[in-house]
Structures are given as structure tokens and as C-alpha cells.
Amino acid sequence: MNTIVMQADKKLQEKIRTDLAQHHISNNNPYVVFSAKISGTTVLLYTSGKLVFQGSNASHIAQKYGYIEQKESCSSETQDIPIIGTDEVGNGSYFGGLAVVASFVTPKDHAYLKKLGVGDSKTLTDQKIKQIAPLLEKAIPHKALLLSPQKYNQVVGPNNKHNAVSVKVALHNQAIFLLLQDGFEPEKIVIDAFTSSKNYQNYLKNEKNQFKQTITLEEKAENKYLAVAVSSIIARNLFLENLNKLSDDVGYKLPSGAGHQSDKVASQLLKAYGISSLEHCAKLHFANTKKAQALLK
């Protein structure tokens, strides 16, 4: 489990309380004045001002509050072989689909990718993503899958086949499988870790399409492998395109993420068109659905 510790001044403490109010959880530690859980990460604020992030997305969330991470570069030592790398975008957003991409990158691609400025898509602006992604789609063999919100709601949820993790396992597995079916021969397959290897393998047993190659799940893989960085950028662009299309469909600007703005837009859609509008453009099992309904009472 990743753990990041920071010191928060009064301004940052107030921001944490405001931003994460909807994710508040109880905590019996008398020295903890605020606690929340978001995207698999627990956030603890202590009376001393100490701010602790614990969980798989600790670094990503902490960076929103001033944490500066020492990034690992995409060094040639870790990727001087043909690699398939995968990443997903949209799993933390209430509106929009879930995009998963697998890309096949060889050492001969490295110079071109570095020239384009390929890196962790989370550090790139949406405008830069939109510029780079079409070039990558033409130059790099890849498979891109998009699970629309409507289809997502049919397969993910309490009474459906998948949960939020198993559906990602299915999509990552399928994207890799399709690349392998096209004859590409990686010496390594890397997934930007969203769960433990044990958990991944347990869910993988339920998948029809299997392959023999070993899979490696690594945290922050988009910073280590150009193949994962490519997938991250293409997936981000695919997600943004889908979000824009859905916005046009419903006539409202749909925000990315799962914050209070998503609650407000969802409540407006509910009032105007009913639950069917959210079935079309949002992931219904998110807590935002109930929060949006509460705003109408």
C-alpha cells in the first residue's frame, strides 16, 4: 500500500475538508479530525496538520494538493524489448464511458515517441492529448475498447455480471488478446496496476479469451514504459471524445470526475429527462446518482 505524508497549513486543511466532504468516512482515532476515502485511497487529516494518503492512488490524489512526486523516467533499461502496455481512463468519472487501450511498442519506436513528448497522460493538457493521440493511433499498433455508459450499466452493478474491478480485468484482457491475435510478439506485457496481481488472476479465470504470456501489473507504469504511456494518451482521448458526444446527446456539458459538479449536472438531467438520461451518459452505481436524487428533494 502506498503511503504519502504531507504537512497541511490551515488553507489546505480547509480545502481538503471541502473537496472531500462527499467522501467523508468515520474514524475513531481521537487525533484524526477529518477522514475520507476516494478511489481506493484513504485520506487522514490529523490535529497536528499532518495529512496522510494511503492506497493505490495515493500519489495521484496527493499531487492535487501540492505533493510533488519524483517521477521515474521511461528509461531504456526497462523497455529495450518489444512491449505491450495497457491503461484505462474513465473509471473514476461518473459521466462518460470506460476506455481501455493496449499498445505494442518496440525500441525502434522510442525516438519518435520521445520526439512527440509522450509521457504520463495525467501530466498533459487535454489539448495536448488531442494533438498527440491521432499521431499515435497511426504510428503504433494498438487496440482501443470503449465501454459506453449504457453498456456499462448493463454489466456492472449489484445484480450484474461485473463489479468495477472485474470489468476492467475483462477489458484489459480483451485488448491484449486482440493484439496478440494480430500476430504481435511482445517480450513483456505490462498493465498499469489498478488491483493486485492475485485479484487480477482470480477475475481472469472467468474470461473466455485466454493466452499463455505472463502479465505484469506495475504501479505508475505509464512513467516507466512508453507502451503504457501511449495507451494512456489514446485512452484519454477516446474518453474525452465520448464525453463530448454524450454532452451533445443530452444537451448539457458533462464534467469529468465524480465531484459535486457531477451531482449538480446529474440532478438537472434527472429533473429534465428522468433516470433514462443518466442511464445513457453516467455510471449509475456511483454514489453521485443518489446524491443527485437528493438534490431534487
From Swiss-Prot:
<keyword id="KW-0460">Magnesium</keyword>
<feature type="binding site">
    <location>
        <position position="87"/>
    </location>
    <ligand>
        <name>a divalent metal cation</name>
    </ligand>
</feature>
<keyword id="KW-0963">Cytoplasm</keyword>
<dbReference type="InterPro" id="IPR024567">
    <property type="entry name" value="RNase_HII/HIII_dom"/>
</dbReference>
<dbReference type="Pfam" id="PF01351">
    <property type="entry name" value="RNase_HII"/>
</dbReference>
<keyword id="KW-0378">Hydrolase</keyword>
<dbReference type="GO" id="GO:0005737">
    <property type="term" value="C:cytoplasm"/>
</dbReference>
<keyword id="KW-0479">Metal-binding</keyword>
<keyword id="KW-0540">Nuclease</keyword>
<comment type="similarity">
    <text>Belongs to the RNase HII family. RnhC subfamily.</text>
</comment>
<dbReference type="GO" id="GO:0003723">
    <property type="term" value="F:RNA binding"/>
</dbReference>
<comment type="function">
    <text>Endonuclease that specifically degrades the RNA of RNA-DNA hybrids.</text>
</comment>
<dbReference type="GO" id="GO:0043137">
    <property type="term" value="P:DNA replication, removal of RNA primer"/>
</dbReference>
<dbReference type="InterPro" id="IPR001352">
    <property type="entry name" value="RNase_HII/HIII"/>
</dbReference>
<dbReference type="InterPro" id="IPR012295">
    <property type="entry name" value="TBP_dom_sf"/>
</dbReference>
<dbReference type="GO" id="GO:0004523">
    <property type="term" value="F:RNA-DNA hybrid ribonuclease activity"/>
</dbReference>
<dbReference type="GO" id="GO:0032299">
    <property type="term" value="C:ribonuclease H2 complex"/>
</dbReference>
<dbReference type="InterPro" id="IPR024568">
    <property type="entry name" value="RNase_HIII_N"/>
</dbReference>
<dbReference type="Pfam" id="PF11858">
    <property type="entry name" value="DUF3378"/>
</dbReference>
<dbReference type="InterPro" id="IPR012337">
    <property type="entry name" value="RNaseH-like_sf"/>
</dbReference>
<dbReference type="GO" id="GO:0000287">
    <property type="term" value="F:magnesium ion binding"/>
</dbReference>
<feature type="domain" description="RNase H type-2">
    <location>
        <begin position="81"/>
        <end position="297"/>
    </location>
</feature>
<keyword id="KW-0255">Endonuclease</keyword>
<dbReference type="InterPro" id="IPR004641">
    <property type="entry name" value="RNase_HIII"/>
</dbReference>
<feature type="binding site">
    <location>
        <position position="88"/>
    </location>
    <ligand>
        <name>a divalent metal cation</name>
    </ligand>
</feature>
<protein>
    <recommendedName>
        <fullName>Ribonuclease HIII</fullName>
        <ecNumber>3.1.26.4</ecNumber>
    </recommendedName>
</protein>
<feature type="binding site">
    <location>
        <position position="192"/>
    </location>
    <ligand>
        <name>a divalent metal cation</name>
    </ligand>
</feature>
<dbReference type="InterPro" id="IPR036397">
    <property type="entry name" value="RNaseH_sf"/>
</dbReference>
<dbReference type="GO" id="GO:0006298">
    <property type="term" value="P:mismatch repair"/>
</dbReference>
